[in-house]
């Protein structure tokens, strides 16, 4: 399968500049390489419970650790527009608003930790702050948030989320519903994967 074959609802991989390993020629190889890289972040953040201060620096650091052996731009906000996400000029401001909103939700306590994690996940996907890996990044940040708050972890069907059809279509529909302000579908979808 060619590397540039695009998956519906994903950032297209038309631009491979910044790809660190030079032996990768297919999307399958890229997915395997990235999964190995992401595992390092999972081990760092989900190995033992710790307090997490979610701020801009930390949000960039998580992405950097997830992709630092795969992409030169790991942990750096994108600097052009793609088919998904806010205009790249708005990324920094939107990320600041997200951090502020999360602090408000935590202080206000009108939303459960689970509902906060779903909104955090959704907003990161909607902003799409990085060139690629935003879905996996958003799910991991949400998992870290849950774990730090003594909540059960989610077991995402990552392979199924890479393939068009079934679960991926349900996931995208749930995200699109959240885009319109209704988090019910995304919460129901996410609940299916609680450990």
Regions found by a protein language model. Name each.
Residues 1-195:
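FIC/Doc superfamily catalytic core
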